[in-house]
Amino acid sequence: MPVLRSLLGGVFTHHPEQCLVTVNPHLGHPLSAGSAPFTLKDEHYFMALDDPQADVFMTTTSEHGEQPGAWRRVEGSGRLAVLTPGHNVEVWLHPSFQALLLNSLRWCGKLL
């Protein structure tokens, strides 16, 4: 397995043309605190999630289906989080996405 795929616990497979994508944080998950579902135009990434131990904390849905949109995992003594939305600035400016990103960074830094 390629090194980056092994590190991330999965790999990008494809995306359709940009469309309305709903980001669905898993309520009650610590990395989803302060976020709520929202829908914006984005690239809907389809992923092959290889790691059965990966902790999915957000899914994405569109007319093309549902996918794991964010997960976290431990690799050795390190932590990493993968978030697939964010190909348009409107996603980055959305308060719920900012909460997901900040929580992920805090968890990776062992502050959460």
Predicted segments with their positions:
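An acidic, glycine-rich "communication" segment
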Residues: 1-62
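Extracellular ligand-binding/catalytic regions of CAZymes and related secreted enzymes
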Residues: 65, 74-80, 84-112
